[in-house]
Structure formats: C-alpha cells, structure tokens
C-alpha cells in the first residue's frame, strides 16, 4: 500500500494489535430491558414485539447503545463496531421493521462515531 494511501487505523495496525469491542447482544440482554424500554416513544404503537431486536435500540434508545460503546472503550477496546448485526431487510422482517433498515444503519453509525 502506498504511504499516501495509509489511514490512521492502518498505521496503528502496523504498530500494534488493536482490541475490538465485545458482544452487544449479550450486553443488552444483561440490562433486562422490558418491551416498553425497547420500544421507546418511537415504536410505542408498533404492531409486533421488538424486545430482542437490539438493533432497534439505535432508534428507540440511542443512549443505551452509546453507553455500551463507552463501556467497551473504558474496558480497553480500541475499536467499536456499529450495533447493526441484524440491521438488514431479512433480519428486521421478523419485527416488521424492514422499511427502517437504512435509518437503523445510519443511526448505528452515528452513535458509534460519537
């Protein structure tokens, strides 16, 4: 790779091993969020249950997702992933949220960058 094309993360990887964050689903499950917690005001009237759809938290409870990122960073992670493991049309169809996939992914990226 030409020197000019190197990104800061590539430069860091050449010098050290970077630690990635952990499992978001496991972390969210440990919070014992209720259905109402998961829905928030945005999806309060949604037609199907969404508890267990941790990606939806990016829209309904972004502060919970941001806190998860902060927890991993405090624990020593160098890199955090977006909370978008199943933020695909197929993954969200179970919850009837497939029409919000773009919004989910944009929110997940926004939260991870913050």
Describe every region a protein language model picked out.
Residues 1-114:
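Domain-level signal for soluble alpha/beta catalytic cores
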